[in-house]
């Protein structure tokens, strides 16, 4: 069990294909075009609460841009200090609500670079551009492209997504286990899908059917491995 817990710490790289869409179809289509360099807007801004997949989408955009032969980089806003860090074809800037004054200036300079530019920026934050505690001229520039709220999945949508994911892995019906996971294992889809994959691999290796006691054991091991996360396994 411990080995599988360690493996969960390195989940597969996020992609657009692995993002559970829910009500976010138009947003996902726009992000695909942004990553390919085909969006008429230079910038896109995503905002939403914890666990909706903002960071997943930024990493997925970086991967898609690389596939399209574009340079791309992911930057966590607190480490942004200069516009010289913003030299890739696609910049994926996370946690914009945590921009420093130097980071705000870097964003301002990026938007005001002269000439026609083919580079683009994807920004994510936990609040809308208007709600950022940033300079007015920075907020207005971040909102100048397309802005999407990343809509959370309903529990029914999460349940259906888990069923589809399990079915694709030829797992038996696990409705009781899925309901348990929704209550006890955090509500972001990355965590839930990783737990299902982990459960599948473990039961195959042990030649045991997936059961609630096994799931409880798995979650307990995760809490031991990640004590700072409290009831959230990852």
Regions flagged by a language model, labelled:
Residues 39-57:
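Walker A/P-loop nucleotide-binding motif
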Residues 203-221:
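Conserved C-terminal helix/linker of AAA+ ATPases
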Residues 83-125:
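Conserved nucleotide-sensing/catalytic segment adjacent to the nucleotide-binding pocket
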Residues 172-184:
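Short conserved motifs of the RecA-like P-loop NTPase core
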Residues 129-143:
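Short regulatory helix/loop adjacent to the ATP-binding pocket of P-loop NTPases
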Residues 185-199:
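The conserved phosphate-sensing helix
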Residues 6-28:
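Dynamic helix-loop-helix/coil hinge segments at AAA+ ATPase domain boundaries and subdomain interfaces
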Residues 145-157:
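Conserved AAA+ ATPase "SRH/arginine-finger" region at the nucleotide-binding site
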């Amino acid at each position: 069990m411990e080995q599988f817990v360690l493996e969960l710490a390195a989940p597969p790289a996020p992609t657009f294909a692995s993002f559970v869409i829910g009500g976010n179809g138009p947003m996902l289509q726009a992000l695909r075009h942004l990553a390919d360099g085909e969006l008429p807007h230079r910038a896109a801004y995503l905002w939403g609460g914890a666990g909706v997949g903002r960071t997943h989408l930024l990493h997925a955009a970086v991967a898609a841009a690389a596939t399209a032969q574009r340079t791309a980089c992911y930057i966590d806003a607190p480490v942004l200090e200069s516009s010289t860090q913003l030299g890739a074809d696609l910049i994926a800037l996370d946690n914009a609500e945590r921009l420093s004054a130097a980071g705000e200036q870097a964003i301002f300079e990026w938007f005001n670079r002269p000439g026609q530019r083919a580079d683009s920026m994807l920004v994510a934050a936990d609040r809308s551009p208007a709600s950022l505690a940033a300079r007015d001229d920075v907020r207005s520039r971040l909102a100048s492209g397309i802005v999407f709220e990343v809509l959370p999945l309903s529990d029914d949508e999460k349940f259906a997504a888990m069923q589809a994911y399990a079915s694709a892995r030829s797992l038996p019906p696990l409705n009781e286990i899925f309901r348990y996971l929704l209550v006890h294992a955090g509500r972001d889809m990355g965590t839930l899908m990783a737990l299902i994959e982990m459960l599948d691999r473990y039961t195959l290796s042990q030649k045991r059917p997936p059961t609630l006691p096994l799931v409880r054991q798995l979650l307990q091991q995760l809490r031991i491995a990640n004590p700072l996360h409290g009831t959230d396994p990852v």
